[in-house]
Each structure stands twice: as C-alpha cells, then as structure tokens.
Amino acid sequence: TSIAEQAKKTAGRRDWDEASYFDELAVRHRDYVPIARRILKWAVERGLDIWWGKGIQDPSFIPVLDFAGIRQQLFGIYLSGVFEVQFQYYKHPPFNHMEYRRELANKLNLISGVSIPEERLTKRPSFSLALLQSEDGLSHVLSTYDWFVNQLKHHATKEGADG
C-alpha cells in the first residue's frame, strides 16, 4: 500500500529541468523560447535560484531570491506562454505591503497590453509572453524585477541591521 500511496502522490507530476522545459516550450510556443531564455539568463546572472515545476499540464520555472534569511519567489514562466506575477507569495518586506505591490503593478502596467487591476494584488495575475516579444516590453519587465530584487535586498539588509 505504501507503493500505491506514493504512486498517487506522484501521479500527474513530472520533474522538469532546463533542457526538458525548453524542449517542450519549443514544441508548444517556439516564438517564446528566446523570451524565456533571456528571462532565465537574467535570473542566473543575478544569482537567483531556479525552481523547475513539477506539473504535467502547465509546468513553469520560477526565479527565487535567497538572501539574508529570506526566500522569495519572483514570478513564473509557464509552458502555456504565460508570465505570472506571484503577489500571493510576496510575504517579505516591502512587498508584503499593498503600496509596494501597487507600485510593482503600476510598473508592469506600463508594458503595452499588461493590465493588473487592484483586486489582483493578492493573487497571481498573468499576461502572455507575447507582450514581451518587443525589446521594450522584455527590457521593461527585467528592469522592473531588478528594482523588485533591489527593494527586497535593501529591506532585508535594513531589517538585519535594525535587529
């Protein structure tokens, strides 16, 4: 029965890695491969951990900041061609406060076609990677998340110094 229990737990799951993710993305959304590769490169260059999803239907990769005692997911890039903002998981200062979530949403809303409404600031809103096919859109989302990471690091360092 323990084997049956384990089989139930792992049913509908798969371990993904960079190679398998990008192979499948090329099948599903070939046009999004350069976008996802650039986002991954950006995350790796900043020393972020990469968490590869386990889903079968719509797996993702998620850059994660691990710094000064905080571990924070940034966003998800899904095989369905979606960029997901992960407000629901923003538990660390300053993004545990609505004013900073609002500022992040406002920055992302400057990308043509992106519209994150106020009521989604505690959820996981998403938009199509197609909106990042322009250099302006992709550069803007990456610079916005540079700001995000810098804010997290600044607050973590400040709290460490205050503690």
At which residue positions do the language-model features occur?
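Well-ordered alpha/beta subsegment
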Residues: L104-D162
